[in-house]
Amino acid sequence: MLLQFTPASAASETPALLHGHLVDIGGGRHMNIVCLGRGSPTAVFEYGLGGNLLNWQKVAGPIAELTTACFYDRAGYGDSDPSSRAMTAGNVTHDLYWLLKKAGVQTPFVLVGHSLGGLYATLYANRFPSQVAGLVLIDPAFAGQDLDETPEEKARAASIYAQSQANIARCAALAREAKLSSNNPAGCVSLPANATEGERTYLAQQFAKSARWDAMLSESENLHAAGALSEDELEEQRAARSFGDKPVIVLTASIIPTQPGETPEEHAKSVGHWKAGHDRLAARSSRGESIVVPNATHMIQLDQPLAVIDAVRRVLLAVRAHRRR
């Protein structure tokens, strides 16, 4: 299943979520993080490919009422400085380690990852197990997600991927020339009709940054590989370990669109493979759950935010109960 970049979305005024804090992570680089609420364990959120902080706007407030909730921008995204290194899962998790350490985020925390962010969250839990108390994975990417494809399916996926990469590269070039704005979207800038003025300003600024498009291009290159495991997948597979008895909830979208040229049989097989991958992630914990969320597309946190809020709440309660033993 080919993961495309996350569309922009907006539904309510969320000023607190957009008021971040730049943290020096070393090497002359700063990364943006915003933490809301109070309580323990902290919940740390990782958005998907091409995402932004507004991807969490429907869940940020309610979860901040339950505990401390921290949201951040990866290198090149939002207000975070770009990295000179490739945006591999290993490098992304390395950055997150130092950001959370320098920001003083208390460990262990609950890691919440969406889409590609789910693969990053999984690898982080593999690499730094003592820092992660539990996981909520929202329609996550996973190692081997494309290995069920026939030669015909691989060819279609390769064509879609090539078109996507070409468009991202085109948008990056336009951004470098300062030619992207809400007045000149050029097929790159998408501002929701229901966005507030503050959200529209924020999104327009994000789309206008060439570093964002460069980061997306690098992330996509390291996520997808025709007929083989990608660099990100290899990194996760090499580091894979049991999650023991840590609470893990994996949420799967119930609305999965058919790809161009895909037959009903191919689509059914792809959906089954996607769910099976999520089941395997949940099975790495003795307290893992794999749940299909009704009436939800890939953007579960926007379509069915209560499902995400409830999953985080349940993992938080499980972690707190374990501490009281």
Where would I find each of the regions flagged by the language model?
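The conserved beta1-alpha1 loop
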Residues: 44-48, 114, 139
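Catalytic active-site module of serine/aspartate enzymes centered on a nucleophile-bearing elbow/loop
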Residues: 284-325
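Active-site nucleophile loop of the alpha/beta-hydrolase fold
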Residues: 136-146
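Residue in the alpha/beta-hydrolase core beta-strand immediately N-terminal to the catalytic nucleophile
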Residues: 109-110, 133-136
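Conserved HGGG/HGGXW glycine-rich cap/lid loop of the alpha/beta-hydrolase fold
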Residues: 25-79, 127
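Active-site loop/oxyanion-hole signature of alpha/beta-hydrolase fold enzymes
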Residues: 34, 71-112, 128, 142, ...
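Alpha/beta-hydrolase
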Residues: 151-280
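Gly/Ala-rich beta-loop-alpha elbow adjacent to hydrolase catalytic centers
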Residues: 113, 117, 121
